[in-house]
Amino acid sequence: MRRLRILVLMHPDFMPPDSTSGYTPQQINVWKTEYDVVSTLRAAGHEVRPLGVQDELKPVRDAIEGFKPQVVFNLLEQFHGEVMYDHNVASYLQLMQVAYTGCNPRGLMLARGKDLSKTLVHYRRIAVPAFVVFPMRRKVKRPARLALPLIVKSLSEDGSKGISQASVVETDEK
C-alpha cells in the first residue's frame, strides 16, 4: 500500500494525545474516535497530521498548502459551533481541490433535513421507519398507518439531540 499524507480535521476539544496511557476510560471516551482514526492511519504507515478546527478556515488552508495532504479525513461535525455549517467545510475542501472523506456538500445539506432525506431514501425503495411531519402549534391527528408508540423529533436537530423520555408518545392524547 502506498504511504499517504493525510490531514485529519477534528474539533480542537477532541485532539487526541499520542497515547492513551494515564487516561481514565471517561477521559478517553471524549476523543476515542479521533484517537482511533489517527492511530490506525499511522499504524498503517501513513503520515498523519491532526488539525483542530473550530472557527477559522485559515489553519485548514495553511495545512493544505504546507503539508500538501493527498487526502483530508474530515471528522468535523460542526463549524463555528453550528452543526448546520458542516457542509461549508466540505465545500471549502472542494474549492481547494483536495480529496476528502465523507459526503459532498450537497449530500450533507440534503441529509440535514430529516423529512427530505427520508423521502429520497424511501423513493429509492430503501426501508425507512414511517414518519409524518406536523406543523407546529396545530392540532395533531395521528395517521392510522403510524402505530404507537411514536418518537417526536425535530426536523433540523442533529442525531438524537433534543430527544428525551418526553419525546416518546404512547397515546393519541399525548
Task: Identify the role of each PLM range.
Residues 23, 82, 151-153:
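Short secondary-structure boundary micro-motifs
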Residues 14, 25-133, 158:
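Conserved N-proximal alpha/beta basic substrate-recognition cap immediately N-terminal to
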Residues 1-27:
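A short, flexible N-terminal coil/short beta segment enriched in small residues
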Residues 4-10, 64-68, 108-174:
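Active-site nucleotide/adenylate-binding loops and adjacent lid/helix of ATP-dependent enzymes
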